[in-house]
């Protein structure tokens, strides 16, 4: 379980970090190399989920989506300095509950 959580966090940081660098390049006129580095990090994001031990692509990506929501809220708060409101936190917790059900529910 710890390994799965670490991989979800790494994938989220790669997706958000890479996307953020591309955003800075295209939306905030940062140098071209921001976009190149962002693109390379996004390629890494595409590889990380394949290291998960869960057998189903759909389940891994659906569960990762919930983790992504949490990380995006935290990124916005820490990097963009946009303080999440109560609804952001409630929605993020709901996503984590859903992820937990999807990944660790007892199945036959």
From Swiss-Prot:
GO terms for cellular component: plasma membrane. InterPro entries: UPF0060. It holds the Pfam family UPF0060. SUPFAM superfamilies: Multidrug resistance efflux transporter EmrE. It is a multi-pass membrane protein. The chain crosses the membrane at residues 5-25, 31-51, 60-80, 86-106. Keywords: Cell membrane, Membrane, Transmembrane, Transmembrane helix. Belongs to the UPF0060 family. This is UPF0060 membrane protein DSY4629.
